[in-house]
Amino acid sequence: MNLNGNGNVNIALVSLTDQGLATARRIGKSLPGAVVQEFYIHEKALCSNNNHREGQSDPQHQLQVFQHLADIIPRLWQQHSVLIFVMATGIVVRQIASLLEGKDRDPAVLVLDEQGKFIIPLLSGHLGGANIWANQLACQIGAQAVITTATDVRGLVAPDEYARRYGWKVEPLNHLPTVNRLLLEQGCLNIWTSYSLKPDEAWVNDEHYQFLSDKDKEKANVIISSFPDLTIKDDLIYLVPPILSVGVGCRRGVSVEAVIEGVTLAIEQLGASLKSLSGIYSIDLKSDEVGLIEAAKYLRIPFQTFPGVELQAVIEREQLNRSKFVKEKIGVDGVCEAASLLGTQRGQLILPKFKGRGVTVAISLENSLSWASGPETLNI
C-alpha cells in the first residue's frame, strides 16, 4: 500500500457514538493493522460494559478514549497522513479549520456518517490521496463515496494526482487551480520533461496529456523537472521529482537553523527546489544529532546515516575531497560528499563540499527516475 507515493501511510480513526464505533470497527477490520496506528472513541460511546469489553479485546486495535476532540486533533494532524472521522462533517470542519497549512502539507481527511453509508474525502483529495481512499474504502464497507473534485467527476486524472502516484511535488502550488481548469476546459494539457526516460504506460496512453518535443517546450502546461523556474506564466506548473540527495557533515551540537540554512544555500546554488530533496544523509556517528533530525523533519524528508567504512569506500572509489581534520576526528576522510552519493541508487555528485555555519553540504543527482506508479487499489 503506497497511496501517498512515499510508503509512509498511517491512519488515525476517530468516532463519537456507539454506532460510529461500529462503523469505525468495520473500517479498521478492512485495513491492515499496521497502517491504523491510532483508534479513538469518545468516552460516552463506551458507557456500556459491552462496548468497553469489546474495545479492550480487539486484537488489532487498542481503543483510546477521549473527552474533547480539541484535545487530540492537533497532535493527530501532525503525526498521521490519513485521518478518518465517523461523525458529522460540520464538527470536523470546525475542529480542523485552524490547522490547515496547504494542500501539500495537510493530511488526507475523510468523513463518514455513523452508519457508514457515505464517505466524503473532505481534504487533500489528490496530493493526500483522500479521493482514492474514499473510493476504495467505499468498496470495502459497502458505502457510497461522495467525490466533488471536478476532474474526478469528469473521469480526468489531474496532474497533482499523477504527482501523488509518483511521490513528486507540485510547484508553484498557487498555479495548480489554473492548470486544472485548463484541463477541464480544453480536455488536454501539454507536458514536457527534461529527462530522457519515458513515463509509464498509464500516462503515455492518457489522451488528455500531450507530450511535447524540446522545440515545443514553450507550449507546456506541465514540466517535469527538479530545477523549476518560478518566474513563469500562471498556466504552467512543475512536477518536481525527489532526485537530489543532500549529504551533511557537521560539528556536534549544530543548530537546526544552521543545517537548514546550509542546505538551502546549497540548493540555491544549483537553482533547484527544496521539494526535489530525497533526504538528508550523514555518517552513523551523527544518527542522534538533533540538528540533523529536526532539519529533516522541518523539510519533511527522511534522515539516514551510513557506517564510516561505507563512506570511506566511496571516497576512495570516487576520489572525493579528503580532510585531515575530519580523518583525525571521526576516522574517515569526509562525510558530506560520500553520504550524498550513498543517498542515491545511481547518482553523480553535482555540488561538491559546500561550507556553511558549522556544516558541510554536498548534493548528488539521481540519474534515473522511477516512473512506477502507486497502486490504483488498496491491498486490503
Language-model region placement:
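Extreme N-terminal starter segment of soluble prokaryotic enzymes
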Residues: G7-L13
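Conserved mixed alpha/beta catalytic, RNA-binding, or beta-rich assembly cores of soluble enzyme
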Residues: L16-G33, L46, F66-H68, Q78, ...
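N-terminal beta-loop-helix "entrance" segment that forms/cooperates
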Residues: V35-R75, E289-V290, V314-L320
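General small-molecule cofactor/ligand-binding pocket signal
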Residues: Q37, V146, Y209-L212, P302-F306, ...
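Short, structured active-site "lid" loops
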Residues: H61-G90, A296-F303
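Short, basic, helix/turn surface patches
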Residues: A138-Q140, E171-N180, K327-L341
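C-terminal non-catalytic interaction/assembly regions of soluble proteins
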Residues: S276-L277, Y281-S340, T344-L351, K355-V359, ...
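Charge-patterned, long linear interaction tracts outside catalytic cores
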Residues: G358-I380
